[in-house]
């Protein structure tokens, strides 16, 4: 009888430890809110001593990002690289038009690798898959880091279409882009002030 209780107890402990092992936190943010999300969620001076294993799941709408989206993504990843440590890991998986792993567990401070993926999303993906979202979770589970904060951050880029080589469409987009670029440049110049306000 004692032996039966010992076996049952050992089995319960094993099941409990396996159920707690692979906890993956999920976050979702639109591209427009990405910089603020990074400011709020990643800070090198946090009290948390846990390292981070972050898989960014970025929506794609063509072979490349438009200029405005590239600027936002690059600024966000530059800010992130300053807000994490060398022990933290970042992976990038793309979904929607291009589904695949674009960056596999690089040092979070390696800004060159991060920016290369933003500049060349299609060529960064070596193997195209059917479902990028499912792939991101499978990849994160396979590359789970014990005693680390493992997460998938979905970056949604709504209402974008791939560039069309039509002169009318191009002219309309150029006019819209000029207005959008002014907004992006204004936001980037205000970024240090926003960060200072948040820190206070």
Task: Indicate where each model-derived feature is located.
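Von Willebrand factor
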Residues: 23-39, 50-106, 113-155, 182-199
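DG-centered beta-turn motif at the end of beta-strands
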Residues: 56-61, 92, 136, 147-172
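Short beta-strand-loop
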Residues: 89-122, 164-170
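VWA/integrin I-like adhesion module and closely mimicked acidic/polar interface patches used
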Residues: 29-33, 83-86, 157-200
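Acidic, polar low-complexity linker/tail segments
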Residues: 2-6, 17-55, 62-69
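Surface-exposed acidic, glycine-flexible loop patches that form ligand/cofactor-binding
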Residues: 44-48, 81-84, 140-148
């Amino acid at each position: 009888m004692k032996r039966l209780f010992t076996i049952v107890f050992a089995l319960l402990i094993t099941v409990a430890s396996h159920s707690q092992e692979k906890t993956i936190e999920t976050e979702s943010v639109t591209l427009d809110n990405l910089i603020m999300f990074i400011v709020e969620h990643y800070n090198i001076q946090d009290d948390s001593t846990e390292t981070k294993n972050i898989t960014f799941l970025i929506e794609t709408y063509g072979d490349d990002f438009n200029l405005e989206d590239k600027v936002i993504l690059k600024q966000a990843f530059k800010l992130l690289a300053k807000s994490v440590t060398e022990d933290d890991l970042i992976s990038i998986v793309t979904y929607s038009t291009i589904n695949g792993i674009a960056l596999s567990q690089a040092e979070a401070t390696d800004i060159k690798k991060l920016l290369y993926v933003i500049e060349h999303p299609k060529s960064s993906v070596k193997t195209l898959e059917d479902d990028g979202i499912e792939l991101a979770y499978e990849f994160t589970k396979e590359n789970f880091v014990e005693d680390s904060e493992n997460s998938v951050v979905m970056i949604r880029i709504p209402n974008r279409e791939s560039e069309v080589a039509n002169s009318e469409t191009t002219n309309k987009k150029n006019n819209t882009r000029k207005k959008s670029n002014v907004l992006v440049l204004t936001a980037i110049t205000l970024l240090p002030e926003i960060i200072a306000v948040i820190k206070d």
